[in-house]
């Protein structure tokens, strides 16, 4: 077994069940690849990504923990976001919130 490995019965795993989700179109308008991790506050991602940041406030990518999505230069893709849970406080990242949402 590899550290962090999950052994399942093979059935589909459901993540973030019951949480509000949002689908957005995101474009990498920069000249460099941009990668965003699973728990990064999406509204605070690299300024080279073009999307509705106000709509993404308080949300993260709806992907498995520890994974990421990569946006190549000029690439446009549709992503799904999910509400942050817990205390709904955001600290760090680009410093745009620094507290309660």
From Swiss-Prot:
Q: Which terms does the UniProt entry file under GO BP?
A: urea catabolic process
Record's keyword annotation contains Cytoplasm: yes
The organism's place on the tree of life at top rank: Bacteria
Please give one Pfam family short name.
Urease_beta
Key word Cytoplasm present: yes
Return the InterPro entries for the record: Urease_beta-like, Urease_betasu_sf, Urease_subunit
Pathway of this protein? Nitrogen metabolism; urea degradation; CO(2) and NH(3) from urea (urease route): step 1/1
Main subcellular localisation = cytoplasm
Cellular component, GO annotation: urease complex
Which GO-annotated molecular functions does the record name? Answer: urease activity
Subcellular localization, as worded in the UniProt entry: Cytoplasm
Ordered alphabetically, the record's keywords are:
Cytoplasm, Hydrolase
Q: Which family does it belong to?
A: Belongs to the urease beta subunit family.
This chain's protein is named: Urease subunit beta
Organism of this sequence: Leptothrix cholodnii (strain ATCC 51168 / LMG 8142 / SP-6)
Q: Lineage of the source organism?
A: Bacteria, Pseudomonadati, Pseudomonadota, Betaproteobacteria, Burkholderiales
């Amino acid at each position: 077994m590899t550290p962090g490995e999950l052994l399942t019965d093979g059935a589909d795993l459901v993540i973030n069940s019951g949480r509000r989700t949002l689908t957005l179109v995101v474009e990498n308008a920069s000249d460099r690849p941009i990668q965003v991790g699973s728990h990064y506050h999406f509204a605070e991602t690299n300024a080279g990504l073009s999307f509705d940041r106000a709509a993404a406030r308080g949300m993260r990518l709806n992907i498995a923990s520890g994974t990421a999505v990569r946006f190549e230069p000029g690439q446009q893709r549709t992503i799904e976001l999910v509400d942050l849970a817990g205390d709904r406080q955001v600290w760090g990242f680009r410093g745009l919130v620094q507290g309660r949402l």
